[in-house]
Amino acid sequence: MAQLRRTLPEYTDPITQDYTEHLVYRLSEFSELTDRRLEIALIDNKSVNAFAAPGGIVGINAGLIFHAETEGQLASVLSHELAHLSQRHFARRMQRQKDRSLANSLMILGSIALAGVTSNPNALLVGQQAITQQNLSFSRGDEQEADRIGFKNMVAAGFDPKSTSYMFEKLQSLSRLSGSNELEFLRSHPLTKNRIADAQSRAQGLEGKNYRNSLDYDLVRNRSIVHFSEVPRQAVTVFKKEVEVAKTKKKILDATYGLALAYSKDNKHSDALENMRNALNIDSENLILQIGLLELHIAAENFFEAEALASSLLSTNPNNYPITMLYNKVLMNKGDYELGEKILRELSLIRPKDPEVWYWLAEVQGLDKNVIGLHLSRAEYFFLNGAYETSIKHLRMAMDLTSNNFQLTESILNKIERSHKSIEALKSVS
């Protein structure tokens, strides 16, 4: 994961990260995975791509959320990737290679991810070697097995059986629009007529049920739409039209939320807050909407209102990821660094592998003059991002300040050793 973070731009939206993690974990409960310790990386790229790799790594382009029109369509892709993981297709593919070294494994993983980010086939060149298309693609048998298992698990999790075929149709449409620049997801997951026909056949006879399509997904998808909107005013126009034509409360709420976010991105904070309150009037219990109001208060620099709301939300949703991250912003603005450090330290125990948590913990510790804590948190941040030498530098600076704390010194020495081992592992595959 650290190697991926060194090359991929992360989509650092706590609300989307939190939603996606819950969805992946839910799907994993219905999968054949025996080890469900997963790390989910959201990648800030508009193209459609997702991948799973040994070590429980699940990479998802934010563009997949942008393009998947329903939660079921997103679930169909994620279930497919979890099936690849549970059936060890990536590992088996490596075993079929003559060179089964870690270097080749990292090359293939990096190529899949990097090509999806750049949308450029040349990105498949890693170092001095080109990974062939045969190496990048799953075999036909692997794809069929992942389709079958992924479909079964997706349906068991409560999603519409037609979601897979609908997503295939979406991918076909996007592929036609992309012209010669074939979608990266289709490079590594070739979409054949047989796969489409099989997906349609599996869905037959499984109709007539109220399937999952949560409001939360629609809201999260609108976040991606606004995020990728280069001209906020155009997004405002689009969502205004959606509000006008919406016929149901759910669609009105969904579009109104998107409109509020678009107004905020366009720095129309009064309009943004008005529309977010309108959305909350329809569903006052939805947590994403409540957090959305908090976000907009912060964007509008209404810090008094933001602090009261953040404190209230965190008291009823302790250690909630997006609420904690937003509350810390409010506390940093207020100068209450001690409380900011407290809530982020608690969150770091729950999310020890989240670089964003360590980054902001280091920031607030620095402001609070906690120099040892600052260096330790920065060391963790750099370690998680694969900058091992920089991590060691901060650990040594922390150790210089802890000469009388033998327990902490021992902990720091262990972390330095951890970084040295990671450096040696990289050298062995270079």
Language-model regions, residue ranges each:
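Acidic/histidine metal-binding catalytic segments
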Residues: 36, 94-99, 121-123, 158-168
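Active-site recognition of the HExxH zinc-binding catalytic motif
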Residues: 60, 76-84, 88, 146
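Short pre-active-site segment immediately N-terminal to the catalytic Zn-binding motif
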Residues: 62-76, 136-141
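Extracytoplasmic and endomembrane cell-envelope/extracellular-matrix remodeling and assembly machinery
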Residues: 10-12, 132-311, 316-319, 343, ...
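Hydrophobic or amphipathic, alpha-helical segments that drive membrane association/targeting
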Residues: 1-51, 174-180, 237, 253, ...
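Catalytic Zn2+-binding segment of zinc metalloproteases
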Residues: 72, 82-99
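Membrane-active amphipathic alpha-helices enriched in small hydrophobic residues
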Residues: 102-118, 122-134
